[in-house]
Amino acid sequence: MIRALFSLFRSLHANTHPADLAHAAALALALALLPRSSLLWYLLFAVCFFIRLNRGLLLLSLVLFGFVVPSFDPWLDSLGNWALCLPRLQPVYRALIEIPFVGLARFYNTMIAGGLVAGALCYLPCYALARCAVTAYRTYLYPKIHHATIFFLVRNAPLCKR
């Protein structure tokens, strides 16, 4: 975990593409909105390791969003109830439930359906905000703190080096 955090620290200051960091933050929010009791959460988490993104930011954001998201559980439950009760989607749900092993994803649960819908709706705005934040950090804040003593000490700490 510490190595992942230092990887994040290096990525913020390196010449990496801001999209890698933004995708990590947006995917962490989408994962945090899903309950961890579903097979869908574990499948999406496993997919994260095959996508080009910053894993340090993914893990850090997942922990941070994990503290905030439980306060939205009633809203996610009602959103999932709304999504599952749509008459147009009833044939789709019936077809999905008949496919073997799809029932293990428990998409019929209101919390999981609400988290899936909310994660899909929040992905693009979170991506745009994170990308703008990384660009603003690199443009305005990094040149000001680049020569600070604390920045030099953290950058040259033994844990930061490989």
Swiss-Prot record:
Keywords, comma-separated and alphabetical: Cell membrane, Membrane, Transmembrane, Transmembrane helix
A GO-annotated cellular component: plasma membrane
Cell compartment(s), UniProt: Cell membrane
Entry annotated with the keyword Repeat: no
InterPro entries attached to this UniProt entry: CHP03546
Protein known as: Uncharacterized protein TP_0480
Keyword Transcription regulation appears in the UniProt entry: no
Entry's transmembrane regions: 28-50, 57-76, 108-130
Organism (species): Treponema pallidum (strain Nichols)
UniProt topology in membrane: Multi-pass membrane protein
